[in-house]
Amino acid sequence: MTNNDTRTQPDAPATTRFPRWPLWARVLLAPLLMLIAAFSPLLPQSPLYFFPDAAKWLNDPANAVGSAPLLLTLAFPTVAALFLVWLAMTRLQRRPLRDAGALWTRASFGLLGVGLALSFAVTFATALPFQSSARGVEDIGSPLWVGILAAVVRGVFMQGFPEELVMRGWLMQVLRDRPLVAVAVSTIIFGVLHYFSSGGQESAGERVLYLLNPTAFGFCAAAFVLLTRSIWPAVGIHAGMHLAHLAGALMGVAFESPTIWVISAIGYAVAGVVVLVLWHRRGGSTEVVIDR
């Protein structure tokens, strides 16, 4: 006897999907992610607020034993940015983290070197002829190896990689279908966020002039993403600036003056335009792809 009794089976639980945010919200998320990552070292450093004597000892740049481990906490933005961009990419863009540039390929090291070389070239070529306008050589104030470690940590792990992962990785992926718009938006937001950066500015007007430099090298970095399909040249530009300033301090070269900021910005802007022209001559692309 055939049993024709059919019972309604309970529906399988629906997979919870994070709602996709509108484009404007995903764009404005970029500066928030960048700021959270930038201030993340306060988390591992927070216990020091209860021990002011220990904090003073660790913050002494002449104290190599103490300052070196404290410098390692400045690498926390890399950890924070990786987590935040992973969360944003997988939940809001529904794409893997590697699409934002968090990958290392055979080409990555060379591309990082290109960014480093460009940053050194622009930094020194635009500063050396204008030393008469500079305000003094930067004082390292610490043993050489600590200064080098500080430049690498700040240039790569505190600023270079996390900021480029957010601004050139996440943000340009949000706008991936409009490459030139992605370049423009990431450049403007990156530049504006540097208004409160400390670079030797002595007035509100100088703060505006100072913005030209990070805005220009942000433009150059974004152009490199289109041409090379990688964020590593941009990371190299960031790290190269810090290492170039360290080398300049050792050589007696100064970099702080409105004239140098403006000339340096012109140097990065010209380099960015050249990179965009190369990208266009190679056929351009209809979307931002990061796979190297």
Located regions from the model:
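Short, Lys/Arg-rich, polar N-terminal cytosolic tail immediately upstream
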Residues: 1-23
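Short, highly charged, low-complexity non-transmembrane loops/tails of multi-pass membrane proteins
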Residues: 5-10, 59, 285-292
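Hydrophobic alpha-helical transmembrane segments
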Residues: 24-32, 71-72, 109-117, 149, ...
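C-terminal membrane module of polytopic membrane proteins
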Residues: 239-292
